[in-house]
Amino acid sequence: MPAYRSRTSTHGRNMAGARGLWRATGMKNEDFGKPIIAVVNSFTQFVPGHVHLKDLGQLVAREIEKAGGVAKEFNTIAVDDGIAMGHDGMLYSLPSREIIADSVEYMVNAHCADAMVCISNCDKITPGMLMAALRLNVPAVFVSGGPMESGKVNVNGKIRSVDLIDAMVAAADDSVSDADVEAIERSACPTCGSCSGMFTANSMNCLTEALGLALPGNGSVLATHADRKGLFVEAGHLIVDLARRYYEQDDARVLPRAIASFKAFENAMTLDISMGGSTNTVLHLLAAAYEGEVPFTMKDIDRLSRRVPVLCKVAPSVVDVHLEDVHRAGGIMGILGELDRAGLIDSSLPTVHSTSLKDGLERWDIKRTKSDSVRSFYLAAPGGVRTQVAFSQDKRFEELDADRSSGCIRDAEHAFSKDGGLAVLYGNIARDGCIVKTAGVDDSILTFSGPARIFESQDAAVDAILTNRIQPGDVVLIRYEGPRGGPGMQEMLYPTSYLKSKGLGKQCALITDGRFSGGSSGLSIGHVSPEAAEGGAIGLVEEGDRIVFDIPNRKVHLDVSDAELERRRAAMEAKGDKAWKPAPRKRRVTMALKAYAAHATSAALGAVRVVKD
């Protein structure tokens, strides 16, 4: 039977000094035999998804102590991708994921914590904590800050839901007046919480439910709604129970690696594909799998994408549908319920809250539950009040959206499309694959070809789009923006938003070894692997080369002969230390970013760092 890790620093004569320090934090004699639970918070006033988390760590801590544990809180960093977007700040976003994972490892291992509750929310924080949980493999429960309410704006006399992306698109559209841009800007992000669409933050918080590491509702109940408080209260009690089961009953089934198994990663990716989640989720799931030594790869994602239909479409893939609407339709357990009925997931797997996912679905799927309290839970509605206060609203919808033929969540028979919302493309320009969010691609451009317009930075591409140098039919190619080449693999939200604002969203393609925001849509192909800085063929494309996209057949092809590509590769290699580097660009790469770039891998491996022994 495993001993409590914390006893390393709380038991024995030689630990008198450590116990003295523990006492200085408030611990008493009777606490030294209890499980020490790390409350891993990520409060910051920089990020709307995290501004309300300050008191929530202590809420969880109080519940842990009521349940018989000892709670010790610490904080991680948290980068707001939206605020960091469009300038060199975005270079730090993806590397911050690794810093978060490392900081959790440092704190939990340095202080011999027995288990942890991870309070995350936004883009890199949930993935970073997930990587840490699988790396450490101590009992863990995830509870996020929750999505913000969608904004509401009057458009031609009609109230429409809006979000961050609407503000960006409107600002770049010369036909929209300054007054209208300001109205959308002021309305787009009305409350605390992660941005209201199926962007990266919400996608990842939804996937923690499918992995089995979070409570039902984690991905969908609003940050402002009183019902969300129950998740934090329950997480505090649950983690003490999980710790006791492992350390006192030798029940290893409660450990993250036992719960987030290969089959659980398949379930999570199946959910992701079915709801058209952010392409960044591919990157983060691969990274988490790497940390947990789970052999889940791009090949598995490709396989799943060919058989999973789209059962739910949310902004930015469609307008006027946000996480509050998904919640009203039964949330993530509602989508998982439909996937289970279609035989597309394995519901026999354990979760932190139920013996099996199937048991959880019996209670939490609105199509099968007999619980009035569960039905009431999924009626939680936006309050419509601008606020940064968690749990401050208590409005409810009058009825659930249980329409599976034309509602927010569909059954397999009435799927939005039989093909999934994400796809892996392969070809001579992306030997190890690249990713496209098919849920955001118009049917008219599922097959597309055009001449490459080459840019060796996001900034150069943005300038070309805004100065009308991109024409209908062009393929905007942005390279040397991968994990190593950027470094940091910037998100390309501004180029995709500006293409849309210029009326080119359905007339152009964009391909890059960088990545896209969860708010991106259109024919946007990212994560090209290998990246240019690693000698990938994307670094050999020349201005005007034709690139062919065939999403139905999962292909992307640079229309250049193998012999010509070999000639270009030889010419590139002949440049010596200047080979596989971008044209000069204004970019300050600090020592911290250089350290990340030195060990970063391409997107096909999740852009994780690999440090050889």
From Swiss-Prot:
Subunit record text: Homodimer.
Top EC class, one word: lyase
Family matches, as PANTHER family: D-XYLONATE DEHYDRATASE, D-XYLONATE DEHYDRATASE YAGF-RELATED
TM helices/strands, residue ranges: none
Protein name stated in the entry: Dihydroxy-acid dehydratase
One of the GO BP terms on file: isoleucine biosynthetic process
UniProt binding sites for Mg(2+): 81, 123-124, 491
Cofactor(s) the record lists: [2Fe-2S] cluster; Mg(2+)
Active site: residue positions: 517 (proton acceptor)
Cofactor note: Binds 1 [2Fe-2S] cluster per subunit. This cluster acts as a Lewis acid cofactor.
Family membership noted in the UniProt record: Belongs to the IlvD/Edd family.
Residues that coordinate or bind [2Fe-2S] cluster: 122, 195
Gene Ontology CC: one annotated term: cytosol
Organism for this UniProt entry: Nitrobacter hamburgensis (strain DSM 10229 / NCIMB 13809 / X14)
Keyword terms: 2Fe-2S, Amino-acid biosynthesis, Branched-chain amino acid biosynthesis, Iron, Iron-sulfur, Lyase, Magnesium, Metal-binding
UniProt catalytic activity: (2R)-2,3-dihydroxy-3-methylbutanoate = 3-methyl-2-oxobutanoate + H2O; (2R,3R)-2,3-dihydroxy-3-methylpentanoate = (S)-3-methyl-2-oxopentanoate + H2O
Any one GO molecular function term: magnesium ion binding
Pfam family, one: ILV_EDD_C
Pathway: Amino-acid biosynthesis; L-isoleucine biosynthesis; L-isoleucine from 2-oxobutanoate: step 3/4; Amino-acid biosynthesis; L-valine biosynthesis; L-valine from pyruvate: step 3/4
Residues carrying N6-carboxylysine: 124
This enzyme's EC code(s): 4.2.1.9
Purpose of the protein: Functions in the biosynthesis of branched-chain amino acids. Catalyzes the dehydration of (2R,3R)-2,3-dihydroxy-3-methylpentanoate (2,3-dihydroxy-3-methylvalerate) into 2-oxo-3-methylpentanoate (2-oxo-3-methylvalerate) and of (2R)-2,3-dihydroxy-3-methylbutanoate (2,3-dihydroxyisovalerate) into 2-oxo-3-methylbutanoate (2-oxoisovalerate), the penultimate precursor to L-isoleucine and L-valine, respectively.
Annotated NCBIfam families: ilvD (TIGR00110), PRK12448.1 (NF009103)
Keyword Ligase recorded: no
